[in-house]
């Protein structure tokens, strides 16, 4: 399970250096093989390949009414291997699609990660913090 936020920088070639605490888990789970695709909220999702295969099957089974979402998730998916130093290449197409600049935030989301442009993430988080908490959280004790 992946959790926590990491502020990182993409290098000049668009590579993300995966934090050590996650790197070891990605190697153990999927031999460093990951899949990146678009998320509808304006970020990228980064899956260990084993988790991606399960997600892909669920998406592929959606009805024709969800065809455009299938295209968004599956049509933009890119398989990448983490290199020997723990870096993942984020393609120019995916970087451009979600507006990734040099400064990014990697969020652990359980079985996958979200990769956000730092300024975009901070703006979305600030807006969410100003809004009322969703009903799904009303039974939680904090």
From Swiss-Prot:
One of its GO terms (molecular function) is transcription cis-regulatory region binding. GO terms for cellular component: cytoplasm; nucleoid. Residues 5-51, 77-120 form the SpoVT-AbrB domain. The keyword Transcription applies. GO terms for biological process: negative regulation of DNA-templated transcription initiation. It holds the Pfam family MraZ. Keywords: Cytoplasm, DNA-binding, Repeat, Transcription, Transcription regulation. It is found in: Cytoplasm, Nucleoid. PANTHER family: TRANSCRIPTIONAL REGULATOR MRAZ. Forms oligomers. NCBIfam families: division/cell wall cluster transcriptional repressor MraZ. Belongs to the MraZ family. This is Transcriptional regulator MraZ. It comes from Delftia acidovorans (strain DSM 14801 / SPH-1). The gene is mraZ.
